[in-house]
């Protein structure tokens, strides 16, 4: 699997594909099934927002790493109208479509980090991360590989 995969979002089938990419990467990185499902659900909600509000966009899924943890990064971009009131859009229960009803607040709750960058008339970028702590054996293997 490449370091970063981009999935164009223009139909429901594209969201399914993006979910699958996220789930596969989560599995490869050692995330639990529960966390893989949380990641896939967050991708689905963000993808539905793209379809509903912008009509199309893209989701980029990649891995990240720090000394003690590995992570998945999901960046969703669209060229839609932007979000006029981010605070309102991030309120629990605020919904404008027919997804799972989680929307942006639900996606934020499912992931460890969540950032929205939006500009009226120019679109929105949502960046989300989910982390998994590395165990000691993983850290030792990586240290040995980098020195050998």
Model-derived segments and spans:
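Conserved beta-strand-loop-beta-strand hairpin that lines the nucleotide-binding pocket
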Residues: 1-6, 47-148
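Bergerat-fold GHKL ATPase/HATPase_c domain
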Residues: 1-41, 141-148
């Amino acid at each position: 699997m490449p370091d970063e995969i981009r999935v164009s979002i223009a139909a429901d089938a594209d969201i399914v594909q993006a979910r699958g990419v996220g789930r596969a990467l989560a599995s490869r990185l050692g995330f639990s099934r529960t966390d893989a499902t949380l990641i896939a659900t967050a991708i689905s909600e963000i993808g539905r927002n793209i379809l509903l509000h912008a009509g199309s966009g893209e989701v980029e899924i990649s891995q990240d790493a720090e000394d003690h943890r590995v992570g998945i990064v999901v960046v969703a971009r669209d060229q839609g109208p932007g979000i006029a009131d981010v605070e309102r859009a991030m309120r629990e229960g605020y919904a404008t479509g027919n997804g799972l009803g989680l929307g942006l607040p639900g996606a934020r709750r499912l992931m460890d980090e969540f950032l929205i960058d939006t500009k009226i008339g120019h679109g929105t970028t949502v960046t989300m991360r989910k982390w998994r702590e590395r165990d000691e054996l993983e850290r030792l293997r990586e240290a040995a590989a980098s020195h050998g």
